[in-house]
Amino acid sequence: MAKVKIKPLEDKILVQAGEAETMTPSGLVIPENAKEKPQEGTVVAVGPGRWDEDGAKRIPVDVSEGDIVIYSKYGGTEIKYNGEEYLILSARDVLAVVSK
């Protein structure tokens, strides 16, 4: 994974989504228009965290670069940068971190 020059703000996370399933477990090929959006990806960059209610200190984000995360199906904003597709998520859209 190449270093990306995108730095998310506040509690935002830049994720490179995993590949959508191309075949069912029984061997049937899934056409492009029927593929489910992946809900798993690798964290590429993390923002510094959002400010607390007093604005005195930042609340850090619970994930780090390189973590594999599971995120909300409809969360985030899809972007394309240097020919690669990414997703910018709020930390609230991350449901779990996958253990390695």
From Swiss-Prot:
One Pfam family this sequence matches: Cpn10
One annotated GO molecular function: protein folding chaperone
Domain of life: Bacteria
Chief localization: cytoplasm
Cellular component, GO annotation: cytoplasm
A GO biological-process term: chaperone cofactor-dependent protein refolding
Organism for this UniProt entry: Mycobacterium leprae (strain TN)
Keyword Cytoplasm: yes
InterPro entries assigned to the protein according to its UniProt record, in alphabetical order: Chaperonin_GroES (IPR020818), Chaperonin_GroES_sf (IPR037124), Chaprnonin_Cpn10_CS (IPR018369), GroES-like_sf (IPR011032)
Keywords: Chaperone, Cytoplasm, Stress response
HAMAP family reported in the protein's UniProt record: CH10
Lineage: Bacteria, Bacillati, Actinomycetota, Actinomycetes, Mycobacteriales
Name of the protein: Co-chaperonin GroES
Family (UniProt): Belongs to the GroES chaperonin family.
CDD domains: cpn10
Function recorded in the entry: Together with the chaperonin GroEL, plays an essential role in assisting protein folding. The GroEL-GroES system forms a nano-cage that allows encapsulation of the non-native substrate proteins and provides a physical environment optimized to promote and accelerate protein folding. GroES binds to the apical surface of the GroEL ring, thereby capping the opening of the GroEL channel.
Gene3D superfamilies: GroES chaperonin
Quaternary structure and interacting proteins, as annotated: Heptamer of 7 subunits arranged in a ring. Interacts with the chaperonin GroEL.
Cellular compartments annotated: Cytoplasm
Gene: groES
